[in-house]
């Protein structure tokens, strides 16, 4: 049995000090749980914070934007608008395509949203056009999310129609079945089909019309049930040659008889194997390709999903002919893994730096080993809790652990330093551990809970930003709690077992030199502190000036939302004149692609032209530029973008918009630039009046660059003005006119060919090669009442007009989206304020509304809540400290250190040229928790000296400052060095980590210098104030 000195209670640490084996096994259990938990943690770029988003796509080839809006989009919107939990509904109706994007509240499960969407589509079915080729198709993806993986399928021996058929049936379906895949899209549009190109002159000479041909084809190709025969002994299934499956069969089809002679389809049309839509095309590095974009489901594990796809690719490619090549052009997980690896390295570097600082101060290997064990144990133990909470290894949780390195060592340092002090005075190690741990136990508890209190407001942040930082805050809080447990259990036990007077007194030349240096520093600090205490009002003036300076810096510093990351992938939009055709766009993308691929930083490029639901209009093309790895190129992504735009600028009549892809996607539609602002009206006419005015005003603002809008109302349209009286007299209905036009120019899908593996379409159109443009309309013939044919020009007048290329809605009303970037030298906050000022200047009417979208809207919300977030952190800490100290006064003394941290952080951000964004604000909030530690350590010892030794407040705080100077300096440097790797990071994802490191290092440097002098002065000021209150209200025996 161990003999304990009287009074050596040890507080909460007593049991663990006296039972070292049990303590060791308990810590081993924490370590083992953390190691096992780490193996089960998924890897991601950021915490999963996706809004539940569903996209509904309806294709109606040949329909104008106006027809798509009124007959497809509007009926769907009316049903979708009745769904509960819907946050925002946007739609885009263009030629032949309607896309409705539904964004739901964060609290609504995606499966519930899916059920509501399916029910709404079913309810709208009867209102949709009866001749839709396919019903509306929904997918659980955010269209603005960049694909997690892009694959290109090429062949130098096979036509693209055959390649797409194989990819669709053998590859895309298998990838779609992978867990986590939300949607696999094939860009390139080369689905096989039988194309029937009518010769207008030939059918007119025979007295036929396109409707006659269409009816003949649809009647000749069917695939329906025919029944069976059931006899006394045998059953027979009925079958027939009702399907035609080759172009040759269609050529031989008899469509009419003239003077008893058959007229075959091949006589009046060119029938060939081709693509279902001839106005779609994709290229990979300028070679024709089928491009597969794989998007994940919201909430899916991106790393696990990509790994599953890569594992099955070899098996899938083996099923394809050797001439077909499948190439992975981009894989977002490559950069995610690199970013996580860099952050893990910075975490290990932070641990090494912290241990180095410990050794520099303690100059004793056993004393250094103790916190050297406490730090990794606290961090590894956190993994076990992260698994339980369904967290992931991502940039934010790793940043939390890196910052925690400086936090968790603080507790161990404070305990070791206090126990070592008693051992050096001659106490036995066991007695010193019990006495030192018992004395410091309340301080550890105060430090822990006051620091966790700072993180509490982060847990209550609303919307997507709150979800984003919940994992960060909880991970850090768990690490701090485990650190407190380790510091009150393992650390004093190890001190009792490993420290001794001999080990602490054993010094070499380096130790003695460091000791002399520290003694001189403490002596200099003592002299300076004495002078400061003799001139308190000057010190208070400095503290007040610091507060004012922090407010001023907060006002002037540029403000942003989220750091722009370099993920190695650039999304682009190529814009051409609104009347551009598919052929001209294909030629322009080739010119642009040639110049982009010449850039040394570009690794691969995919381009797409055509309208397919993802690309809204024919005069725009989509690009995805994949850059070389960061260590293989000299420039960051923004420099590459500037260089590419300069290279393309000399190509006439095209505009290239580029933006880097981001891990955090808040938008619900693909934009030309990073930020969006919408203008909404009740009618298209009102919108057309105000869009040019606002766009011109925005383009003149220096705070904005690359301003553009999706308002396109100058597309060419041929208006067929039918003379209804003349048409009626001839027995021709408006439906007949529409059918004739659709047959000729709509790439009309008139029949379906069924096979065992897939279904293919028969496409009807006029061969317009000999009569291009509006002249082709003159070849249209219609059947009159007497059976003859009438030219369209006999009953209609053709006019050329301007019409919108697409019609966009936001919550069922017409809307235009303005896209913009922020030029160098300005911040997002500057741009937002400039837009708001412009809006006031224009004096928009009441029926015109504006709203920021996506990340700009989130920035506004975050900016409005930032001040309240910091205030909430301060109030939470005050409440916790007030409860712990049973005092209204001492928490104020501790919190008086906070302005110094704010000044240092803001100055560091300004000097580094960094914006005050969400990451930097989190750093400032963490500083609130770190900086107050200095004051807590001073005040705890001062109060103990007053209470136990009867010292005066001045002598008590003076002695406390000198006694706690070394641990204060040690813990501050540990926290600083824990943040230093983040500040100096240069690898993948460094843009995300650097603002946090800059804010924390700057705040710690300034606050360390100032709080050592301002805290004791403020302590004495409030002590006098407390005495004054007691003298005025003597009935209050206890401190108010």
UniProtKB/Swiss-Prot annotation:
It is found in: Cell inner membrane. Pfam families: ACR_tran. Keywords: Cell inner membrane, Cell membrane, Membrane, Transmembrane, Transmembrane helix, Transport. The chain crosses the membrane at residues 25-45, 347-367, 369-389, 396-416, 440-460, 472-492, 537-557, 863-883, 888-908, 910-930, 968-988, 998-1018. InterPro entries: AcrB_DN_DC_subdom (IPR027463), Acrflvin-R (IPR001036), Multidrug-R_MdtB (IPR022831). One of its GO terms (cellular component) is plasma membrane. The keyword Membrane applies. It comes from the Bacteria. GO terms for molecular function: xenobiotic transmembrane transporter activity. Signal peptide: none annotated. It is a multi-pass membrane protein. Coiled coil: none annotated. The keyword Cell membrane applies. Belongs to the resistance-nodulation-cell division (RND) (TC 2.A.6) family. MdtB subfamily. HAMAP family: MdtB. PANTHER family: MULTIDRUG RESISTANCE PROTEIN MDTB, PTHR32063. Part of a tripartite efflux system composed of MdtA, MdtB and MdtC. MdtB forms a heteromultimer with MdtC. This is Multidrug resistance protein MdtB. It comes from Salmonella paratyphi A (strain AKU_12601).
